[in-house]
């Protein structure tokens, strides 16, 4: 049996992402949701059929752009990586995400 990595979930982070303008069209209309990374970047943990990426791999998308992403629109899907980086940058600048340094050896299994 192949084990699945536990995905990182954080409701506060998802709420923060949902309050941002849409990454694709910049709209702020109350329909923005946190879109999880999709199939084109699955090596990054983008899930797959019945799987969802970790909450850290999200970006804000309005209803229309989110619908386009889930219908395979390359104009949205091809820019997921930079949208996620932009979202992470905003979260770090606003103190939503903070990093505490620990040596690499600390994380070894």
For each predicted feature, which ranges?
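Intrinsic-disorder/low-complexity regions
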Residues: 4, 9, 28, 66, ...
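Polybasic, low-complexity binding patches
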Residues: 44-59, 67-109
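Generic signal for short, ordered secondary-structure residues
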Residues: 1-4, 40-44
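Short cysteine-rich loop/turn motifs with clustered Cys
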Residues: 8-39, 64
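Amphipathic repeat-derived elements
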Residues: 1-5, 28, 80-84, 88
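Arg/Lys-rich, low-complexity, intrinsically disordered N-terminal tails that contact nucleic acids
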Residues: 1-13, 109
